[in-house]
């Protein structure tokens, strides 16, 4: 289930810049005993991301309320929150993008995390190197292709 701009739905316009350019930021939070862990830290992460990416998102109180509501009644889970710049015209200019999109989803807490905690993990080196861009350093932006390639390599090599 996705909550997109406050409505339960599972579709996003193809014109949304999250799809077109990976133009947005996200955070992933743990839900425990009905609460979103470190809620304010996740809000600050999103605020920082929007500020650095110059996304004019202003609905912080609404977002905070939605995050809390999605955690209510759940023993455990994972809450992902995405803020995209929203829909806009063709091309890289974001000048016409005045209505950012907020996307929230909840999923089950991964079962393998408990196993990792008990048994540990094995590390390996990836042939995929992360790019360096000081302006984006530390941001959880939507362009995660390097991480996708790293994960694909791990799966293909059984690492």
Residue ranges of model-derived segments:
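Phosphate/pyrophosphate-binding loops at sites that engage ATP/ADP/AMP, CoA/4′-phosphopantetheine
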Residues: 70-74
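Short coil/turn segments at beta-strand junctions that form active-site/ligand-binding loops
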Residues: 75-77, 159
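ATP-grasp fold ATP-binding core
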Residues: 78-83
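Helix-start/capping segments and mature chain N-termini
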Residues: 1-68, 84, 89, 93-159
